[in-house]
Amino acid sequence: METEVEHTGLAIHPMDQFIVRKLFCHTESASPMNECTTNIHWYDITNVTMWMAIAVLVIAAILVLGTRRRAIVPSRSQSVAELLYGFIHNMVEEVTGHEGVKYFPYVMTLFLFVLCGNVLGLLPLSFTTTSHMAVTVPLALMVFVGVTALGFMRNGPGFLKMFWVTSAPLAIRPVLAVIEVISYFVRPVSHSIRLAGNMMAGHAVIKVIAGFASIAVVSPVVVGAVTAIYALELLVAVVQAYVFTILTCVYLRDAVGDAHH
């Protein structure tokens, strides 16, 4: 039976890095489509599970080390923790207003988790958890369901007024209302696909270009290109975490702020 690599003719397939594998698997098959990558159940510990756990441990380490010995003259770890705290706190307050600050802990947790998932994926032999819809969709759905529930809890049926554009002419308001409802329910789709798509695309490009490094004539150029793209991917990792978080704040503003357009 031909393996996936043999079928495509590539020595290293750029998408192999995104295959979910069980950590504890007994098989002698060298095929990428073996028992380790099939028949995965919800209780199996996979590479996704492991790297999400590592991300949580990294977040805990940053916050614990940064707040363990607080001083007027902050240490490096305290400076990092205070920088992250101040950055996210200001973002939440500026976007959602004073009423949204009470939800700052959730927003900061979300930002740190996405950021660590993105950055850890750049380490050699690691796994980018945020490149999988199985990770980004639940994150986006938690935001969507939470914001919707909060909106009805705070505003009651008045939360639905956000779909009725009062600034538009009366004749086209029903049409705009339908568009607003559709765009509202599309939020978790765009919220999750944006993050997963950007993280997957960048890593795939790096793998494709790195595949030419075995050609001696172009290897110096390839190494330089991979280094440049790698630096760009580090920036993308931070930017995508920021975009995911600020969109969460924008959606949160609909629930805690005025629901009228």
From Swiss-Prot:
Keywords: ATP synthesis, Cell inner membrane, Cell membrane, CF(0), Hydrogen ion transport, Ion transport, Membrane, Transmembrane, Transmembrane helix, Transport. GO terms for molecular function: proton-transporting ATP synthase activity, rotational mechanism. The chain crosses the membrane at residues 45-65, 107-127, 133-153, 162-182, 209-229, 232-252. It is a multi-pass membrane protein. Pfam families: ATP-synt_A. Belongs to the ATPase A chain family. This is ATP synthase subunit a. It comes from Cereibacter sphaeroides (strain ATCC 17025 / ATH 2.4.3). The lineage of its organism: Bacteria, Pseudomonadati, Pseudomonadota, Alphaproteobacteria, Rhodobacterales.
